[in-house]
Amino acid sequence: MFDPLLEKLHSSIRIQGGETAAVPDGLRECRNEKKNSWIRSWLWQVPGFRRWRVSRLDAGESLQVLNSVAYPNYNIDQPLMGLDLLWFGKRQKLVAILDFQPLIQDQSYLERHFQGLKTLQNRFPELSGEETMRLFDPNQYFSPWLLFCRGGAEKATNSLPEAFNAFLHCYWELHQQNSDKASLIPAAEVKQLQIAYDIYSAERDPAHGLFTSHFGKAWSDRFLHEFLFPASTKADSSPPADADDDLPR
């Protein structure tokens, strides 16, 4: 379902000078033969970004997932890029969230960085996230203009690909704009804000239970704290585990 979008994302990263980086040992890929599911992840080094991670989960007709978060360099105060795409094939249900995730909720910060996303929300009114903001804490890492898509196969094959491409283009444009001007938030503060994002997200990640059900607790704990949110407070507390040792039976 999401392989064309995954290739589009990777292609756009390569065009911007991105090169693949090493994923922590044992976290590059994991499989559950019993559930016929697998997850594969990539880490990218991209000019202007501290890290850019991508993950793709394939559980057949049960579930398809594409997730990515981009962390700009500390000397750039632009929002993080976050996307979560989920397809439940048996129910023919799509859930997609695409957002520029703000470091702070200050009005002047939002005005500086979110004009492009505002335009996209107007361009794709069917993806307006206004009604879904009740699902998220509006004061923590979500913007008022996130793109939210929930629907069936028609949206998955028509609305989503066009919005996905426009979203990526918009974020690259924002990055180019920020590369040409000074950041208004000091680099040391941006670093602390990105660390706070990892801590907040690791504590609340709704996908952790999903990963655990497919790939076991030990592997999923490592994945959460060593790959998804490595700056979280528990990053060094999870012992190494063999990916095959803790699969659910």
From Swiss-Prot:
Gene3D superfamilies associated with the record: 3.40.1500.20
Source taxon at top rank: Bacteria
An annotated Gene Ontology molecular function: cobalt ion binding
Recorded coiled-coil stretches: none
Known catalytic reactions: 15,16-dihydrobiliverdin + oxidized 2[4Fe-4S]-[ferredoxin] = biliverdin IXalpha + reduced 2[4Fe-4S]-[ferredoxin] + 2 H(+)
InterPro entries per record: DiHydbiliverdin_OxRdtase, Ferredoxin-dep_bilin_Rdtase
GO biological process, one term: phytochromobilin biosynthetic process
Calcium listed as a keyword: no
Keywords in alphabetical order: Oxidoreductase
EC number: 1.3.7.2
Reported function: Catalyzes the two-electron reduction of biliverdin IX-alpha at the C15 methine bridge.
Family stated for the protein in its record: Belongs to the HY2 family.
Name of the protein: 15,16-dihydrobiliverdin:ferredoxin oxidoreductase
Organism, scientific name: Prochlorococcus marinus (strain MIT 9313)
Classification lineage: Bacteria, Bacillati, Cyanobacteriota, Cyanophyceae, Synechococcales
